[in-house]
Curated annotation (Swiss-Prot):
Function: Catalyzes the transfer of a methyl group from 5-methyltetrahydrofolate to homocysteine resulting in methionine formation.
Ranges annotated as spanning the membrane: none
Co-factor note (free text): Binds 1 zinc ion per subunit.
PANTHER family (UniProt xref): 5-METHYLTETRAHYDROPTEROYLTRIGLUTAMATE--HOMOCYSTEINE METHYLTRANSFERASE
Protein name per the record: 5-methyltetrahydropteroyltriglutamate--homocysteine methyltransferase
Record flagged with keyword Amino-acid biosynthesis: yes
Lineage: Bacteria, Pseudomonadati, Pseudomonadota, Gammaproteobacteria, Enterobacterales
Length: 753
């Protein structure tokens, strides 16, 4: 019985974000296509070599993508929307970039494809578009070229291919509606062709990713798997690969498939190894996803060994990362500023490869000494004073139902707020951030690098805040913001000011295309050593008689956009953050700030993959928000902001937040999103976004008025606010001024009737 190890994929961007820099240089016209392609080749060769040197037996090939792997699969199948096609019908790398970002160095610009979250991760994929009667053919041979590349370098190659059913599941029908599952028989011949080409190259195993098999799929989709895989069998061995959840609910469907192996995520799923071994066909290989591919923690390898050792010798076994290492930073060894103790608790992608090598060797030999040595720091961490703060744990344990209740119901609060603020009908505001100019970024960077002292930095930030207030007063906005000049990122800023978080220098992970993020890491109990936002909010308020909003990022969003601890529940982390920010609300209130916004853009995206698990998550997610906000007095107005395209299925929870005002992203849906609020009879105030901040286009007064009138047909006008869709951080001042002037004018026109 063989024991091997492998990874499901490796980060693409490069340690120094070389791919990002090459992409952006090419898009800007500063480098050639050949130079871009050369960077890709160099990164792939380096990453294969690094995995091999770290002890990986089977190397993933096909995990590299120029923008996104789902988009790569779409091109492989010839699925190019008409608006992005080349006149001669050819497909090239610019076709791919036009789908991903709407434009490329060649070809006509056209609207980019929709982008959405890859399952429950912070990675985004480009949504495939389907139209009735479309044809599929093998069009983009990137996978085959990269397999040839890796074979020429002498590597042991395992191609990675997104499976046909999951690819269809991830897409959307455009135009005339039809069942996208009906396209399955049209795409299978392309998959057969690709597998035949791989067989010609002497490939033994192909990793075929079907993560949709962890979802609660409709029966018709589950039934589609058997005929699909019947059509694909017999050319090469197929490792059916799942991740992000367990497979037990769909195991009957899986075990009927003509594949030769199954990969299971044993980190995020609840599947028992003994049960899997019992139910899988005896000649199947089991790939055990034991090492967490989407976090940064060193594994306790003694625990992982115990989890899997009983099936050693009973079937072919591969040990693996739970999912692709795409979701982890690349290399811990280049982090020079982390405290030695804290650093010993982490493992990034390359260190996770080393963990897989240690685990394979121990399972082969039975000698676990190296596992014990590797696991010692993570075991010692359990007793570290950096992890446990008795005061935080005591405060969390003492929470009562009263702590998540405002003193009075919305109707009573609204009366007190009207008396305090005396706002006009159709009150105007913005979501929080103003353009982050080069001057602002340079100021922050100089301060961070030590090239600017604290006094000069503070003077500079104060000047930018003052400018933001002057601009808003000139425009005639009713509720102002300070503009967030001091903040680099809405999560990082709070993480830097809370105990229990650490930051990396190079811990970049890909979000989409060329965009990378560097998430904070929650290492211990979270608390607030000092006020975070009060000073600048108070300063901004001193410059105007109009109310200035205090701006906080909510507890669930901070949790979802960070690497969480693994030793406590996500609920515990969210509530600890909520308690820390509750103190911030109290301090803002004491400083005279009467309107406080708590942003929760990630509340919906944190939903578990299975709907049957939603209620428990939403219950604690809502409770965390309410703990954060409930300390506010009746005449303090609590706002929240959310940017989703779907509210229907969580409307109860949105209402349960009990925010006085919710601002939402609605302009791109032409106010259709408000239907959910109307049907639910949402009781509080709403600010439906009246223009799309992601576009530099300036909306006309008439267009904004028309949207607001449409909104007033669904929600009583006295409960409507007027605001953009989202923060204005990425926009320039000229279009920001023009758009806000038109927005204010539209509100004034409506007041006049």
């Amino acid at each position: 019985m063989t024991i091997l190890n492998h990874t499901l994929g490796f980060p693409r961007v490069g340690l120094r974000r070389e791919l990002k820099k090459a992409q952006e240089s090419y898009w800007a016209g500063n480098s050639t296509r050949e130079e871009l392609l050369a960077v890709g080749r160099e990164l792939r060769a380096r990453h294969w070599d690094q995995q091999k040197q770290a002890g990986i037996d089977l190397l993933p090939v096909g995990d590299f993508a120029w923008y996104d792997h789902v988009l790569t699969t779409s091109l492989l199948l010839g699925n190019v929307p008409a608006r992005h096609q080349n006149k001669d019908g050819s497909v090239d790398i610019d076709t791919l970039f036009r789908i991903g970002r709407g434009r490329a160095p060649t070809g006509e610009p056209a609207a980019a494809a929709e982008m959405t979250k890859w399952f429950n991760t912070n990675y985004h994929y480009m949504v495939p578009e389907f139209v009735k009667g479309q044809q599929f053919k093998l069009t983009w041979t990137q996978l085959l070229e990269e397999v040839d590349e890796a074979l020429a370098l002498g590597h042991n190659v395992k191609p990675v291919l997104l499976g046909p059913v999951t690819w269809l599941w991830l897409g959307k029908v455009k135009g005339e509606q039809f069942d996208r599952l009906s396209l399955l028989n049209d795409i299978l011949p392309v998959y057969q062709q690709v597998l035949a080409e791989l067989e010609k190259r002497g490939i033994e195993w192909v990793q075929i990713d079907e993560p949709a098999l962890v979802l609660e799929l409709p029966q018709a989709w589950l039934d589609a798997y058997k005929p699909a895989y019947d059509a694909l069998q017999g050319q090469v061995k197929l490792l059916l690969t799942t991740y992000f959840e367990g497979v037990t609910p769909n195991l009957d469907t899986i075990t009927a498939l003509p594949v030769q192996g199954l990969h299971v995520d044993l980190v995020h799923g609840k599947d028992g190894v003994a049960e899997l071994h019992k139910r899988l066909p005896s000649d199947w290989l089991l790939s055990a996803g034991l090492i967490n591919g989407r976090n940064v923690w060193r594994a306790d390898l003694t625990e992982k060994y115990a989890q899997i050792k009983d099936i050693v010798g009973k079937r072919d076994l591969w040990v693996a990362s739970s999912c692709s290492l795409l979701h982890s930073p690349i290399d811990l060894s280049v982090e020079t500023r982390l405290d030695a103790e804290v650093k010993s608790w982490f493992a990034f992608a390359l260190q996770k490869c080393h963990e897989l090598a240690l685990l394979r060797d121990a399972l082969k030999s039975g000698d676990t000494a190296a596992l014990a040595e590797w696991s010692a720091p993570i075991q010692a961490r359990r007793h570290s004073t950096r992890v446990h703060n008795p005061a935080v744990e005591k405060r969390l344990a003492a929470i009562t139902a009263q702590d998540s209740q405002r003193a009075n119901v919305y109707e009573v609060r609204a009366e007190a707020q009207r008396a305090r603020f005396k706002l006009p009908a159709w009150p105007t505001t913005t979501i929080g951030s103003f353009p982050q100019t080069t001057e602002i970024r340079t100021l922050r960077l100089d301060f961070k690098k030590g090239n600017l002292d604290a006094n000069n930095y503070r003077t500079g930030i104060a000047e930018h805040i003052k400018q933001a207030i002057v601009e808003q007063e000139r425009l005639g906005l009713d509720v102002l913001v300070h503009g967030e000049a001091e903040r680099n990122d809405m999560v990082e800023y709070f993480g830097e000011h809370l105990d229990g978080f650490v930051f990396t220098q190079n811990g970049w992970v890909q979000s989409y295309g060329s965009r990378c993020v560097k998430p904070p890491i929650v290492i211990g109990d979270v608390s607030r050593p000092a006020p975070i936002t009060v000073e600048w909010a108070k300063y901004a308020q001193s410059l105007t008689d109009k109310p200035v909003k205090g701006m906080l990022t909510g507890p669930v969003t901070i949790l979802c956009w960070s690497f969480p601890r693994e030793d406590v529940s996500r609920e515990t982390i969210a509530k600890q953050i909520a308690l820390a920010l509750r103190d911030e609300v109290a301090d803002l209130e004491a400083a005279g700030i009467g309107i406080i916004q708590i942003d929760e853009p990630a509340l919906r995206e944190g939903l578990p993959l299975r709907r049957s698990d939603w209620d428990a998550y939403l219950q604690w997610g809502v409770e965390a928000f309410r703990i954060n906000a409930a300390v506010a007095k009746d005449d303090t107005q609590i706002h929240t902001h959310m940017c989703y395209c779907e509210f229907n299925d969580i409307m109860d929870s949105i209402a349960a937040l009990d925010a006085d005002v919710i601002t939402i992203e609605t302009s791109r849906s032409d106010m259709e999103l408000l239907e959910s609020f109307e049907e639910f009879d949402y009781p509080n105030e709403i600010g439906p976004g009246v223009y799309d901040i992601h576009s530099p286009n300036v909306p006309s007064v008439e267009w904004i008025e028309a949207l607001l009138k449409k909104a007033a047909k669904r929600i009583p006008a006295e409960r409507l606010w007027v605001n953009p869709d989202c923060g204005l951080k990425t926009r320039g001042w000229p279009e920001t001024r023009a758009a806000l002037a038109n927005m204010v004018q539209a509100a004034q026109n409506l007041r006049r009737g």
